[in-house]
């Protein structure tokens, strides 16, 4: 629970923003006092690695009162300086590398404080079709709405779009222009500017990108969400939807979105104008990863039990198929790219950790499988869950057998091992 003082401040801001959608907030930075910073600290993740200064959350907490008092004084006097973020790379599903930035823990606290202020305002503006980086709005909520609207509104066409390198290519002058429609506080702007200009440290080399926001920062997803709200969501609701002849909708999770249309002509109009809209703000719709998918409900004369058109969204392939009762329904299964990436990750992990104590291997492998089942365990996807489960057993046995020349494990012995170290079984978690 937030402290009453901070809660009251944020509620007042939210009420003002809701009452007047055109209101511009000029004075917000002064609200970030020691109590506000303490609340931001409480809502900052303590589990991530240290930034370039090497200070962990645990070390910062050892002298929390002094640290927050000093931080507030530096913020108040303008002496606060943002540190560069440390860049690490993670593998994407297509095999490419994605850069992730690690801010210092202190910078995360200040970013969280600013994010709390911005969220109090923009949560009143965001549309129901926006799900990413919003409290209480999960990917599974987005998947549920997508399925329901496709089935109930006679949607026949899906615009499956992809933004090229959104976080890296986000145009900062345009971002400033968008934010100033609601927030024009010089103090907040100076803080945001310091984070954007702080630079990126990679292998001891400091660089200063002129575009984009660093993925991994606390403030980055908030800024990115606000920008796409203006570039895409508000534009779609105010300018696109009224011009359509049939029903249509937009569902977005962070920078991943789909548009559903009842009529093909409407979908093609959107496909034609979408790249132009994004280009106005320095963004690019990927030409080969963006497609128009025929996704209409099959009629009674369709001979197959499977409809033709499919599309991927949030790690799932969406498709029409017949239920056990013989009715056409939309189901979801783990997308092939995600399935392949999961299997590759399991294989690499079992290979890398094959010499670790068996109990430790079992514990970590179980955590990985539970995490996978927790996300992908939706109704109709049990077969893909079983594929992952069987592959985990296969990879584990293979690399346990290669710990030494004498450690080969036959299936019979491995089954006995699984009686002691039983891996989690696939289960459906989300009935959506």
Regions found by a protein language model. Name each.
Residues 1-432:
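Non-catalytic terminal/accessory segments
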């Amino acid at each position: 629970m937030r402290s009453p003082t901070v809660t009251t401040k944020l509620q007042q801001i939210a009420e003002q923003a809701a009452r007047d959608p055109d209101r511009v907030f000029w004075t917000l930075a002064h609200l970030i006092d020691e109590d506000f910073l303490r609340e931001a600290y409480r809502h900052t993740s303590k589990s991530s690695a240290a930034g370039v200064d090497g200070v962990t959350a645990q070390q910062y907490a050892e002298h929390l009162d002094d640290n927050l008092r000093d931080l507030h004084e530096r913020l108040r006097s303008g002496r606060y300086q943002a540190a560069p973020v440390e860049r690490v790379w993670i593998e994407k599903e297509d095999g490419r590398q994605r850069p992730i930035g690690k801010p210092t823990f202190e910078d995360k606290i200040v970013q969280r404080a600013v994010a709390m202020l911005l969220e109090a305002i923009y949560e009143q503006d965001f549309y129901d079709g926006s799900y990413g980086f919003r409290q209480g709005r999960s990917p599974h909520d987005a998947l549920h709405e997508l399925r329901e609207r496709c089935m109930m509104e006679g949607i026949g066409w899906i615009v499956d779009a992809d933004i090229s390198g959104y976080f890296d290519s986000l145009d900062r002058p345009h971002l400033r222009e968008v934010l100033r429609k609601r927030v024009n506080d010089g103090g907040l702007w100076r803080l945001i500017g310091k984070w954007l200009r702080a630079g990126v440290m990679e292998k001891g080399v400091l660089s200063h990108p002129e575009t984009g926001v660093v993925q991994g920062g606390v403030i980055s997803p908030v800024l990115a969400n606000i920008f796409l709200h203006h570039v895409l969501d508000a534009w779609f609701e105010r300018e696109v939807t009224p011009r359509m002849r049939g029903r249509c909708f937009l569902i977005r999770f962070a920078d991943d979105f789909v548009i559903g249309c009842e009529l093909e002509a409407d979908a093609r109009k959107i496909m034609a104008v979408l790249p132009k809209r994004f280009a106005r703000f320095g963004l690019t719709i990927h030409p080969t990863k963006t497609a128009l998918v025929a996704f209409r409900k099959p009629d009674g004369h369709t001979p197959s039990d499977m409809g033709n058109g499919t599309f991927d969204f949030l790690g799932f392939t969406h498709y029409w198929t017949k239920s056990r009762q013989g009715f056409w329904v939309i189901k979801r299964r783990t997308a092939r790219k995600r399935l392949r990436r999961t299997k590759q990750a399991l294989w690499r992990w079992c290979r890398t950790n094959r010499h670790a104590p068996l109990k430790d291997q079992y514990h970590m492998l179980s955590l990985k499988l539970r995490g996978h089942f927790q996300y992908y365990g939706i109704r109709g996807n049990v077969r893909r869950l079983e594929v992952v489960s069987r592959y985990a057993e296969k990879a584990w046995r293979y690399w346990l057998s290669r710990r030494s020349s004498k450690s080969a494990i036959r299936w019979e012995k491995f089954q006995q091992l699984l009686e002691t170290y039983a891996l989690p079984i696939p289960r459906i978690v989300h009935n959506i």
